[in-house]
């Protein structure tokens, strides 16, 4: 399914990664406060006479271009998210600010001050998510979950959240929106699942926190939604997958939030398994069934087939740094990030790839951080290093060195391709 890997070096540790919802674009937030946006090559199948072909195609076939780069925050850039339409990139940093910038140019259009803690200190962000064109969600270290109404014409740094909740006793470690109901008129999600500490919670846009699970006696770190599973009995074929600190993936039936109903051991190890830091469901277009990619604290990415409930394949992102970011772009390529590296995993081709590399060869791109051109995209002097404070990469668990030498550098999905098609998902 995937074959070669492209490596994008970064100038500092990765804290956050966001994929554009409509274009082959990835943005990264770094420990240095920088935000950088790359444009990936488009599919070769695109028409040669397409006048809207992106800059990558015009500048040279297969080039990965830096669209813009700037020091967006005085301190670390903790989290990033694109708006629903992809026009706006939201970032939040340890300087206590949310910034909304044009995704294409990086020019800041608005700023919002994050509410401080009771003692007046900065409440650093942990997650930012655009729930709809009207609603922006922000979670912080203090366990607060703020809701901003984007329809209100904010003045700079004066905006206050419309609502604030505390769904957990600890900071919110993951946030997963639930699909809109069949009766929804907007088509946008109005409920979401969060994890924090050892609990899972469901919050509603209008009614606040609806339910909180029992104590799972394990730190819950990551989550994602998967639908289209086989419905039977009380199961409607919709589940939320939750990754824990001990290497266990738990399955939660949508609507039955008191406790988990299934467990999958993704990574076993002496003294406890490896933490499951991030995950993403493989796009249906890839034709691999119901499979979720799981990024681990030891730098591996494992592919778990839901239904069979087993690990089907794995690859190595990095031998020493954990996986912080994981997702699939609009062309079905997997993008992983962690440490000072982002990797783009391409779908397998026969013979040489579109960059002239043969399957299994690792392609390096060294121009991503050679220059700070475009650092003036933020017109508020954000590229000043004075007073900047860096904190540690936001791995939910302590990063550990992967065992073994020489990580696999190609997408070896033989197991995924060869598993019997009779498996019921």
UniProtKB/Swiss-Prot annotation:
Gene3D superfamilies: YVTN repeat-like/Quinoprotein amine dehydrogenase
InterPro entries: WD40/YVTN_repeat-like_dom_sf, WD40_repeat_dom_sf, WDR55_POC1
UniProt biased composition (Acidic residues): 367-385
Compartment annotation: Nucleus, Nucleolus
Species for this entry: Aspergillus niger (strain ATCC MYA-4892 / CBS 513.88 / FGSC A1513)
Family of this protein: Belongs to the WD repeat WDR55 family.
WD repeats by residue range: 9-48, 72-111, 117-158, 221-262, 318-355
Gene that specifies this protein: jip5
UniProt-annotated stretches for the region Disordered: 40-63, 358-425
Basic residues compositional bias, start-end: 395-404
Origin: domain of life: Eukaryota
A GO term from the CC aspect: nucleolus
Protein name as catalogued: WD repeat-containing protein jip5
Record flagged with keyword Nucleus: yes
The entry's keywords: Nucleus, Repeat, WD repeat
């Amino acid at each position: 399914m995937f074959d070669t890997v492209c490596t994008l070096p970064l100038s500092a540790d990765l804290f956050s990664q966001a994929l554009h919802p409509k274009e082959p674009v990835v943005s990264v937030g770094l420990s240095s406060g920088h935000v950088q946006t790359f444009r990936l090559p488009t599919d070769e199948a695109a028409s040669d006479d397409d006048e809207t072909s992106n800059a990558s195609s015009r500048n040279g076939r297969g080039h990965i271009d830096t669209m813009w780069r700037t020091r967006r925050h005085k301190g670390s850039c903790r989290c990033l998210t694109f708006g629903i339409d992809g026009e706006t990139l939201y970032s939040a940093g340890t300087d206590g600010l949310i910034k909304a910038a044009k995704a294409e140019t990086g020019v800041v259009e608005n700023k919002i001050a994050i509410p401080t803690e009771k003692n007046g200190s900065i409440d650093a962000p942990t997650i930012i998510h655009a729930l709809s064109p009207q609603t922006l969600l922000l979670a912080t270290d203090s366990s607060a979950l703020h809701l901003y109404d984007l329809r209100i014409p904010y003045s700079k740094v004066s905006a206050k959240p419309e609502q604030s909740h505390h769904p957990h006793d600890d900071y919110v470690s993951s946030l997963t929106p639930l699909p809109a109901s069949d009766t929804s008129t907007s088509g946008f999600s109005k409920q979401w699942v969060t994890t924090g500490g050892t609990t899972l919670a469901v919050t509603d846009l209008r009614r606040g926190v609806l339910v909180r699970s029992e104590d799972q006696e394990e730190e819950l770190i990551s989550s994602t939604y998967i639908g289209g599973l086989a419905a039977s009995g009380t199961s409607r074929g919709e589940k939320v997958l939750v990754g824990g600190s001990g290497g266990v993936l738990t399955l939660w039936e949508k609507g039955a939030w008191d406790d988990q109903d299934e467990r999958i051991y993704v990574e076993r190890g002496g003294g406890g398994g490896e933490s499951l830091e991030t995950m993403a469901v493989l796009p249906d277009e890839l034709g691999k069934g119901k499979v979720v990619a799981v990024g681990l604290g030891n730098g591996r990415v494992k592919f778990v087939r839901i239904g069979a409930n087993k690990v089907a394949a794995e690859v190595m992102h990095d031998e020493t740094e954990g996986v912080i970011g994981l997702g699939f772009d609009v062309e079905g390529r997997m993008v992983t990030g962690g440490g000072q590296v982002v990797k783009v995993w391409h779908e397998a081709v026969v013979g040489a790839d579109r960059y002239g590399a043969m399957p299994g060869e690792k392609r390096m791109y060294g121009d991503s951080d050679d220059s700070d051109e475009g650092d003036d995209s933020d017109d508020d002097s954000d590229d000043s290093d004075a007073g900047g404070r860096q904190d540690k990469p936001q791995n939910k668990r302590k990063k550990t060195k992967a065992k073994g030498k020489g990580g696999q550098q190609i997408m070896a999905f033989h197991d995924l391709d060869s598993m019997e098609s009779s498996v019921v998902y």
